[in-house]
Amino acid sequence: MFYVEILGLLPEMAEAEVKALAELRNGTIKERDYLLVVGNVENVEIFERLGLAHEYGILLGSGDDVRDILDLVRGLEWKEIIKGTFAVRKEVMVNCAHEVKNLEKIIGGIIHSQGLRVNLSKPDTIIKVYCGRKLWIGIRIREFRGKEFDERKADRRPFSRPIALPPRIARAMVNLTRATREILDPFMGTGGMLIEAGLMGLKVYGIDIREDMVEGAKINLEYYGVKDYVVKVGDATKIKEAFPGKTFEAIATDPPYGTSTTLPMDRDELYKRALESMYSVLEGRLAIAFPSDFDALDVAETIGFKVIGRFYQRVHSSLSRYFYIMEAR
């Protein structure tokens, strides 16, 4: 069993990201308790790709009350679970339904009584206890620190433009496509989506109608160590012209919204033509963002897409958007 602690930002989208990655390893989500998602998966290392998560780990068990969780702790052979020193960390979620004061100390004492050493400052193993509707306990494998994503924000790139998706969201969009080999971004801009996909080991393809953006994206990809890429000047409404005879396993993209750029045609017409172009080269899934005042559902389904997910985000007072997950039928 695994657990993932997702971000409070876009929680439904974060849960869908976990589900998409779990499915790549024949896994399923069993339950979500506020910001804790638990389930089964053949190999938890797939979660190294996560974007909208605080951490993930191995789930040891759960309890309906404190007595249950303490009985579970007493029944485990901790010398077979813990490597080196340990510390217990407690996470009290908004929906915590239990009295958990000092619970981490009590659990730590039980484990220590089995002959294991505590190190609160630099433990080799971190045991996580979560309080929600139920109580959960697991072993942390990886914590995703904000700093590593901040280093890839638009203003930290050598070639920068102010309007770009946050790296965590871009990464989640790539994951929602369930890509395993390659991905295309037909509105690549400065390459943020391609950077995240490339760092996951995917081959990345991108086009942009502006030559300066293409050259800038190359600079950014090289800066972050992404080597397996093909980027060129191209029109998102004419992808086949940019890549003759090529189809793509997955597409993830964030088209211009029309507020920060001069569009080459009417905004809604651009979106429609771009969706038609993407449909013509797509083998699997598309993850795409649109402003909330664009009727993407109707347009996409008319083209032939099956919309399998939609997630709302209010960015600021003058912009709200939906992230869509679509499949080519």
UniProtKB/Swiss-Prot annotation:
Top EC class, one word: transferase
GO molecular function terms attached to this record: tRNA (guanine(10)-N2)-dimethyltransferase activity; tRNA (guanine(10)-N2)-methyltransferase activity; tRNA binding
Keyword line: Cytoplasm, Methyltransferase, RNA-binding, S-adenosyl-L-methionine, Transferase, tRNA processing, tRNA-binding
Principal location listed in the UniProt entry: cytoplasm
Domain THUMP, residue spans: 40-143
Reactions catalysed: guanosine(10) in tRNA + 2 S-adenosyl-L-methionine = N(2)-dimethylguanosine(10) in tRNA + 2 S-adenosyl-L-homocysteine + 2 H(+)
Pfam families: THUMP (PF02926), UPF0020 (PF01170)
EC numbers: 2.1.1.213
Domain of life: Archaea
GO CC list: cytoplasm
Subcellular location: Cytoplasm
Gene Ontology biological process terms from the UniProt entry: tRNA methylation; tRNA processing
Thermal properties: Hyperthermostable. Remains fully active after 2 hours of incubation at 80 degrees Celsius.
Quaternary organization: Monomer.
Homology family: Belongs to the methyltransferase superfamily. Trm-G10 family.
Function comment: Catalyzes the adenosylmethionine-dependent methylation of the exocyclic amino group (N(2)) of guanosine at position 10 of various tRNAs. Acts via a two-step process that leads to the formation of either N(2)-monomethyl (m(2)G) or N(2)-dimethylguanosine (m(2)(2)G).
PANTHER family, A to Z: N2-METHYLGUANOSINE TRNA METHYLTRANSFERASE, THUMP DOMAIN-CONTAINING
Protein known as: tRNA (guanine(10)-N2)-dimethyltransferase
